[in-house]
Amino acid sequence: MNDAVELVWPNKDLSLRASGLTSYEWVQRTDCRLSKPLKVEGACDGLSARSNVLVVGDGLDALEALGATPVLGDGIRLVYIDPPFNTQKTFNQYGDSLARPMWLSMLRDRLDALRPHLREDASVWVHLDDSEVHRARAIMDEVFGESAFVASVVWQKRTSRESRSAFSSNHDTLLVYAPSGPRRWKASRNLLTKDEALLRNRDDDPRGPWADAPFTAPGYRKAQQYDIVTPSGEVLRPPRGRSWYATAKTFEDLLADDRIFFPRNGSGSPRIKLFAHQLRGLVPFTVWGAADVGTNDDAKRHLMELFPDTSVFDTPKPEELLERVIHIATNPHELVVDLFAGSGTTAAAAHKMRRRWVTVERNTQTVLDFTLPRLLKVVRGEDSGGITGQFSWTGGGSLEVLHVAPRFGALTGIHRSSAFMGSAGTLLSTARNEQRATG
């Protein structure tokens, strides 16, 4: 008996390919036009496994083009994508309305194309709101398997209240999948750093400030059931259903090393002192508050500082949010991929954190107005916002730009490969000349 549950939609058996600047076209997977070579402009021959790459084009075409270069050769450690939410609204920089079958195929096809390039310890994070997140989870179950699901992370994207709605929506959801499964991925993911600002030195310990934790452990262990006498003379036993954290011998050693703290003027239950180098990281919660990772408004203010004379995105993501995702899912120099670059937040955060990155944006005007100028500011050390201070970022590194024309439809004006590369080349050469002049 087959117990598989499947989401079905019109034209599911077809492939959805980019056509022209913003359209899509349904094609048979055997369509001979799919074997036609892609038109790629940029320094493909100069790309290496260490390159950071901004690709102008559709995500499917970009992955195919990069597959012929060394860029993806070591595998992708993190995919973070923030696709159009399909809210049926129009925003400053883009329209957000696709027929649902197209939206579903668009997401499915790009996840399918990413899968062969993922490392064994990779994770895929898809950022959505309530418009399509439930259907997206069904698609991700189909592409990666239900057993690959790790978590649904809820991000508090705003702190102001919307009084015109039945409910004031203040969250997005990040669906997290690990193709190797959550148990194996857990072994390689990073914990959150404990806030060392919370450490205190309440007894002037010469080893420095410390935190403390209960000197108890769950469960009954005979060797860890014994009397402890507090400095005030009280005799304590472990609480019901628990044991002391360690054996009596270990407790005596810790006590002699001044690693045991008795609160309430020496009459409280023992607690173990933990210094900064002994602190274990924190397992991430599935709810991320605005105070920890910022809001859309925080990100918007950052963009307005970078582009004071331009109408910026309505719902950009803060670098602090991406910093947490990238910290959990990667280590320095590993590859981060985003197929929906927008203003370039993912690549900007990855660059400041010294990760390699590939970011893809289909809209050439968005790239010229936001993505490329922002990333050049990061490289030149001219972006003081976001996570710059946290990582003491002062500039450095480099990036390459490719233009991948769609196989279907036509591009006109500035959107054509040669015209775009001319404008992008001007931005790049100006930035490099300025770097040489100030270096």
Description of each model-found segment:
Residues 4-9, 14-22, 100-104, 131-133, ...:
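Conserved S-adenosyl-L-methionine
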Residues 100-153, 376:
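Conserved Class I SAM-dependent methyltransferase catalytic core
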Residues 160-217, 407-422:
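Flexible, glycine-/basic-rich loop-and-beta segments that form/coincide
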